[in-house]
Structure formats: structure tokens, C-alpha cells
Swiss-Prot record:
The gene is mutM. PANTHER family: FORMAMIDOPYRIMIDINE-DNA GLYCOSYLASE. Keywords: DNA damage, DNA repair, DNA-binding, Glycosidase, Hydrolase, Lyase, Metal-binding, Multifunctional enzyme, Zinc, Zinc-finger. Monomer. InterPro entries: DNA_glyclase/AP_lyase_DNA-bd, Formamido-pyr_DNA_Glyclase, FPG_cat, MutM-like_N-ter, Ribosomal_uS13-like_H2TH, Znf_DNA_glyclase/AP_lyase, Znf_FPG/IleRS. The active site is at P2 (schiff-base intermediate with dna), E3 (proton donor), K61 (proton donor), R267 (proton donor). GO terms for molecular function: 8-oxo-7,8-dihydroguanine DNA N-glycosylase activity; class I DNA-(apurinic or apyrimidinic site) endonuclease activity; damaged DNA binding; zinc ion binding. GO terms for biological process: base-excision repair. Involved in base excision repair of DNA damaged by oxidation or by mutagenic agents. Acts as a DNA glycosylase that recognizes and removes damaged bases. Has a preference for oxidized purines, such as 7,8-dihydro-8-oxoguanine (8-oxoG). Has AP (apurinic/apyrimidinic) lyase activity and introduces nicks in the DNA strand. Cleaves the DNA backbone by beta-delta elimination to generate a single-strand break at the site of the removed base with both 3'- and 5'-phosphates. SMART domains: Fapy_DNA_glyco (SM00898), H2TH (SM01232). Its EC number is 3.2.2.23, 4.2.99.18. This is Formamidopyrimidine-DNA glycosylase. It catalyses: Hydrolysis of DNA containing ring-opened 7-methylguanine residues, releasing 2,6-diamino-4-hydroxy-5-(N-methyl)formamidopyrimidine; 2'-deoxyribonucleotide-(2'-deoxyribose 5'-phosphate)-2'-deoxyribonucleotide-DNA = a 3'-end 2'-deoxyribonucleotide-(2,3-dehydro-2,3-deoxyribose 5'-phosphate)-DNA + a 5'-end 5'-phospho-2'-deoxyribonucleoside-DNA + H(+). Belongs to the FPG family.
Length: 287
């Protein structure tokens, strides 16, 4: 699933190409793509046609497009969603779900989603902050993110530190890939109890999270397959710089010990057994 760097890369591309443009036509080609908009496809299109996109913003892994009507389009890419800018004459993608045409007859915006786990909806009056995503915490790169509040909240969590990093109510945008990478840099095993971290250790971990996210954004995110691309259909390149994620049995880039893969929440965690020894006290339940 796309994490903060991938979604931010898409946001930057959308901001460049759709800000200030007036929506002339909306075509919903698959109802599942707007399942979070209970009023249905006709209403979805009606409230958007004639509005102008003011900006493109992000909260964690969610995007939203504030409109001059005061409403907002909310988007989540899910596992395979893509927001692509295409010439109107370009052939339709096999999994095209929603199409936006603009009054200037320039490139159209297409929501393409093979697995249909992503989706779009309209938030009434949600231009400044859609209520549907207001509960999601700020991300570590947000200028208004509070380091002190994060450190205090993290150290109160009676759960494993990796589970805490994935909790979108604590901080948003961090998923499996970047949690593993930040923990490797911090020399912490993901099973380390969060409430056992010192304040300085928690702050150092946050610094590594920020560094990893920032570096990934510069590389356009991480692409392991053709499902994640930017608005121009281009893949990201941060996978070349990953230190542990997806590198099971390969040598740790720091000490040479083979990277270990462990089952984690129906996914996998990657760590170095030497640099990140598993703690003696490991919590199994989240809290």
C-alpha cells in the first residue's frame, strides 16, 4: 500500500497540474470507486461539475482537493490506486474507474485502480479539513506536528514500537516499509515495548522516521511493482536505497549479518539480528 512518500509524490504532481482548473465533466465507470460516497455516482458528478480545484492537500495517506464550492474531493489509493494525468485522446486504461475532464480541454485526471481497494468521495464543506479524515494524526513532516506530544504519547503506549509507528492516530503516513527502515536506522527491534523507550530514544527514532520519509520523497517513493506510479505513470526509485525491507537473507548494510524476515500482522518485518536484537520482554497485544 502506498505510504506517505508515495502519496506526497502524487500530491505534488496533482498540485502542479490540476490547481486552478474547473471541472467540466465527471464520469464514474465503476461504482465501487465511489463506495465511500453514499449518495451515489450521479450526485458525485453533479456536485463536482462546475467547481474549481483550489489546491491539493494531504493528511497521512489521504489526499483531498479543496474546491471553490467549499466542498472537497477525498482520495485514498488503497493497494493499487493511481491518479494519472492523461491527454484526452489517450486510450482508456484497463482499470479506469473515474474520469475528470476540465473546462480548459487540457489533460484529464483519471483514477485507475486494479484491485478497487482505493476510492474517491466528496466531503460536504470539507475544503479546509474533511471531517472524514480529521481523526488522523498529523504526519512527522507536517510543520504543526508536535514532537513533545508524539514522544509523550509513544511512551504511554503499551504495545510494540512498530505497532505504535503504524497507528495512524499517533502519527500518520508511516507504513510497513518506512517503519522497518526507521527502526533499522535507530537500531531498535520492532518488538521493543514502546513504553520502555526513553525520551531521547523516542526523539531519535522520530528523527530517523523523518529522514527516511524525506529521502523517499526525493526519490519519488518506493515502487515494487507497476501498481505504484506518479501522475505521469513513472515509478519511484527509493527501493534501491532500502537497507532492510525486502532484503531477507541479504547482508545488513551496516554489519553484514543476514537480514531476518519475521511474520508481523499478516505481513512481514525485516531487521538485522545483530544491530536490532529482539528484546527479552516483547508485547504481543496492541494497546
Amino acid at each position: 500500500m502506498p505510504e506517505l512518500p508515495e502519496v506526497e509524490t502524487v500530491r505534488q504532481g496533482l498540485a502542479q497540474w490540476v490547481t486552478g482548473r474547473r471541472i467540466a465533466e465527471v464520469e464514474v465507470r465503476h461504482p465501487r470507486a465511489i463506495r465511500r460516497h453514499p449518495a451515489g455516482a450521479a450526485h458525485f458528478a453533479d456536485v463536482l461539475v462546475g467547481t474549481t480545484v483550489r489546491d491539493v492537500r494531504r493528511r497521512g495517506k489521504y489526499l483531498w482537493l479543496p474546491l471553490d464550492s467549499g466542498d472537497a474531493v477525498i482520495g485514498h489509493l488503497g493497494m493499487s490506486g493511481q491518479l494519472l494525468l492523461q491527454p484526452g485522446a489517450a486510450p482508456d486504461e484497463a482499470h479506469l474507474r473515474v474520469r475528470f475532464r476540465f473546462a480548459d480541454d487540457g489533460p484529464e485526471l483519471r483514477f485507475v485502480d486494479q484491485r478497487t481497494f482505493g476510492g474517491l468521495s466528496v466531503s460536504a464543506g470539507g475544503a479546509e479539513m474533511p471531517t472524514e479524515i480529521a481523526h488522523i494524526a498529523r504526519d512527522p513532516l507536517d510543520p504543526e506536528f508536535s514532537e513533545a506530544a508524539f514522544v509523550a504519547a509513544l511512551r504511554r503506549r503499551r504495545t510494540e514500537v512498530k505497532r505504535a509507528l503504524l497507528d495512524q492516530t499517533l502519527l500518520s503516513g508511516v507504513g510497513n516499509i518506512y517503519a522497518d527502515e526507521a527502526l533499522w536506522r535507530a537500531r531498535l527491534h520492532g518488538a521493543r515495548p514502546a513504553d520502555g523507550l526513553t525520551g531521547p530514544a523516542a526523539l531519535r527514532l522520530l528523527g530517523h522516521v523523518r529522514d527516511v520519509l524525506g529521502e523517499a520523497i526525493k526519490e519519488g517513493g518506493t515502487s515494487f511493482d507497476a501498481l505504484y506510479v506518479n501522475v505521469n505513470g513513472e515509478s519511484g526509485y527509493f527501493d534501491r536505497a532500502l537497507n532492510v525491507y525486502g532484503r531477507a537473507d541479504q547482508p545488513c548494510r551496516r554489519c553484514g549479518t543476514p537480514v531476518r524476515r519475521e511474520a508481523f500482522m499478516n505481513r512481514s518485518s525485516y531487521s538485522c539480528p545483530r544491530c536490532q536484537p529482539r528484546p527479552r520482554r516483547a508485547l504481543q497485544a496492541s494497546g
